[in-house]
Curated annotation (Swiss-Prot):
Keyword list, A-Z: Cytoplasm, Lyase, Phenylalanine catabolism, Phenylpropanoid metabolism
Reactions mediated catalytically: L-phenylalanine = (E)-cinnamate + NH4(+)
Superkingdom of origin organism: Eukaryota
E.C. code: 4.3.1.24
Active site: Y117
Species per Swiss-Prot/TrEMBL record: Arabidopsis thaliana
Protein name (Swiss-Prot/TrEMBL): Phenylalanine ammonia-lyase 1
Length: 725
């Protein structure tokens, strides 16, 4: 065990003494300046969350996981849990002596007649019973704990996902390697062989309260090791295996294990199933939280938002590190953004007629996401401590020649961390839903079409309407899942386990929440890309309309019937202002319709000029009113064709104005969705449904392919806000 970083194996021993500020006892080293470990816990929180996520990803991608008992990481657990991954596990040979020393101690103490829980006694509330048949006791332990239900129907599965089982196996090996559990090293090698050969025991999905550890599910790993006839496993190609077939495929030639005293208890009395699944959940949650930060910034881009919401002073005055980092990341994405430059020009037009600030879903996104990131980060560190902890009972202290009866099997850090993480996930999902709802609503989205429809005929295209309904469903379920699990504890096992952590149940519910957040992230990301493309189309259509209006104005309004300069020539500048101010998608499907605002406002410009033309209006030659009919007729003859030509050029990828997203730091994410995954602009004119495109992105997120383009968006970020000048 260690606190200051210098490991002392259980087999050694030195007298208690002070040395270099540390307190050394027979089996541990305690930092005298941090005896309660608060300082070490705080030290782990230094640096940015993004850097921590990058480290997780780097660990996830390493080809080998070296286990020694105290350095296992969330990223490594996630890597091993991934089905089909080629990552291998290697055990530290230096741990062998300590592991075997504790195993030998158990045998020696039993032979001496020492009374130890689970070695010579019954279990739990029946620990008053005694036996000298330690081997038979371990066999009975595994038998009665095999109480899970798998079911035989095809439509429902009551089997723990294989990924979670692999995570549990890895964590259990790691915790047993520290040499306080009384189990042979050979058993840990056998579990490692199962992992390295992609052989996964079948564990029940339910049936554990994660105190005393995950007894029921872990007993099925022990059942496979001992060759119980009811034990099952799945091979590398998904084939069902018996215990005998599993041993053969794993290359374990020693045969089934006859568990020695304490070994069955060592295998089952730990929190590995709950903490293993929690590790998987937190790896994905950390990635999705960074994605939410980036999407909030891109949301600001496509909404033509005001970037001052990321100003460093605002967040420095609030002091919360999660908020400061979230704002700094968004600030980095928006810094130099071509969309923000365009938005600034837009906001400078008629500023007194527009809202002074954006709505909360945009403007307070750093304040909203920051606390969630802090919660997720603390939960990550808590679970990382848990997977490197010794979690069974009793603990074998060879150096003091005693078995210590305690309660490290209580998985409260898992239950609490997972409940908190689930709340954070629900909050991220709620923000995403609020942002999505603004994006698809033409009353809020600064000129984008309702439902992000992209067809020429909006009456036959309802865009993301179905997706918005689905998002409401996702968000509702996510908020329901945010309810705590740990407040539903029941007294168990004859009131011996009268408080219990429900760690795995909470981990399972959090895993469900992560899946739903992935659905929401997928839908929102595709909608963001749709909005990017609609902004691109909007810019090309607006320029086309401006050019056409300018040409028609020059042709019709510049001169009179005799070629003389006409007073109406001064209308052109104001006509172009109308085009700049009018939202393109309010008229794009029929630009010359008298019921649409473009023609109405262009006509009003000419009328206003006529009203100030004074006496000249009485003369038909100089009258501006007389020009209105000719102007509109010429516009109707030309504009629809030009707008259709601009749309056709856009569809063919030959637009005159390139897509602004290519000039933005958020471009790698857009490129990934559009080019690498092959999604396209959704319209009612095409057969492709939104769900088909969502599936492509969802699969990519589940496979971790979103990580690289996401990180590429932040490659240039230096880990700090932009300096205040």
């Amino acid at each position: 065990m260690e606190i200051n970083g210098a490991h002392k194996s259980n087999g050694g021993g030195v007298d208690a003494m002070l040395c270099g500020g540390d307190i050394k006892t027979k089996n541990m080293v305690i930092n005298a300046e941090d005896p309660l470990n608060w300082g070490a816990a705080a030290e782990q929180m230094k640096g940015s969350h993004l850097d921590e996520v990058k480290r997780m990803v780097a660990e996830f991608r390493k080809p080998v996981v070296n286990l020694g008992g105290e350095t296992l990481t969330i990223g490594q657990v996630a890597a091993i849990s991934t089905i089909g991954n080629s990552v291998k596990v290697e055990l530290s040979e230096t741990a062998r002596a300590g592991v075997n020393a504790s195993s030998d101690w158990v045998m020696e103490s039993m032979n001496k007649g020492t009374d130890s829980y689970g070695v010579t006694t019954g279990f739990g509330a029946t620990s008053h019973r005694r036996t000298k048949n330690g081997v038979a006791l371990q066999k009975e332990l595994i038998r009665f704990l095999n109480a899970g239900i798998f079911g035989s129907t095809k439509e429902t599965s009551h089997t723990l996902p294989h990924s979670a089982t692999r995570a549990a196996m890895l964590v259990r090996i790691n915790t047993l390697l520290q040499g306080f559990s009384g189990i042979r090293f050979e058993i840990l090698e056998a579990i490692t062989s199962f992992l390295n050969n992609n052989i996964t025991p079948s564990l029940p999905l339910r049936g554990t309260i994660t105190a005393s550890g995950d007894l029921v599910p872990l007993s099925y790993i022990a059942g496979l090791l001992t060759g119980r006839p009811n034990s099952k496993a799945t091979g590398p190609n998904g084939e069902a295996l018996t215990a005998e077939e599993a041993f053969k495929l794993a290359g374990i030639s020693s045969g089934f294990f006859d568990l020695q005293p304490k070994e069955g208890l060592a295998l089952v009395n730990g929190t590995a199933v709950g903490s293993g699944m929690a590790s998987m959940v937190l790896f994905e949650t950390n990635v999705l939280s960074v994605l939410a930060e980036i999407l909030s910034a891109v949301f600001a881009e496509v909404m033509s938002g005001k970037p001052e919401f990321t100003d460093h002073l605002t967040h420095r005055l609030k002091h919360h590190p999660g908020q400061i980092e979230a704002a700094a990341i968004m600030e980095h994405i928006l810094d130099g953004s071509s969309y923000m430059k365009l938005a600034q020009k837009l906001h400078e037009m008629d500023p007194l007629q527009k809202p002074k600030q954006d709505r909360y879903a945009l403007r307070t996104s750093p304040q909203w996401l920051g606390p969630q990131i802090e919660v997720i980060r603390y939960a990550t560190k808590s679970i990382e401590r848990e997977i490197n902890s010794v979690n069974d009972n009793p603990l074998i202290d060879v150096s003091r020649n005693k078995a210590i009866h305690g309660g490290n099997f209580q998985g409260t850090p898992i239950g609490v961390s997972m409940d908190n993480t689930r709340l954070a996930i629900a909050a991220i999902g709620k923000l995403m839903f609020a942002q999505f709802s603004e994006l698809v609503n033409d009353f809020y989205n600064n000129g984008l079409p309702s439902n992000l429809t992209a067809s020429r005929n909006p009456s036959l295209d309802y865009g993301f309407k179905g997706a918005e309904i689905a998002m409401a469903s996702y968000c509702s379920e996510l908020q329901y899942l945010a309810n705590p699990v740990t407040s539903h504890v029941q007294s168990a096992e004859q009131h011996n386990q009268d408080v219990n952590s429900l760690g795995l149940i909470s981990s399972r519910k959090t895993s469900e929440a992560v899946d739903i957040l992935k659905l929401m992230s997928t839908t929102f990301l595709v909608a963001i890309c749709q909005a990017v493309d609609l902004r691109h189309l909007e810019e090309n259509l607006r320029q086309t309309v401006k050019n056409t209006v300018s040409q028609v104005a020059k042709k019709v309004l510049t001169t009179g019937v005799n070629g003389e300069l006409h007073p109406s020539r001064f209308c052109e500048k104001d006509l172009l202002k109308v085009v700049d101010r009018e939202q393109v998608y309010t008229y794009a499907d029929d630009p010359c319709s008298a019921t649409y605002p473009l023609i109405q406002k262009l006509r009003q410009v000419i009328v206003d000029h006529a009203l100030i033309n004074g006496e000249s209006e009485k003369n038909a030659v100089t009258s501006i009113f007389h020009k209105i009919g000719a102007f509109e007729e010429e516009l109707k003859a030309v504009l629809p064709k030009e707008v259709e030509a601009a749309r056709a050029a856009y569809d063919n990828g030959t637009s005159a104005i390139p897509n602004r997203i290519k000039e933005c730091r958020s471009y790698p994410l857009y490129r990934f969705v559009r080019e690498e995954l092959g999604t396209e602009l959704l319209t009612g004119e095409k057969v492709t449904s939104p769900g088909e495109e969502f599936d492509k992105v969802f699969t990519a997120i589940c496979e971790g392919k979103i990580i690289d383009p996401m990180m590429e968006c932040l490659n240039e970020w230096n880990g700090a806000p932009i300096p205040i000048c």
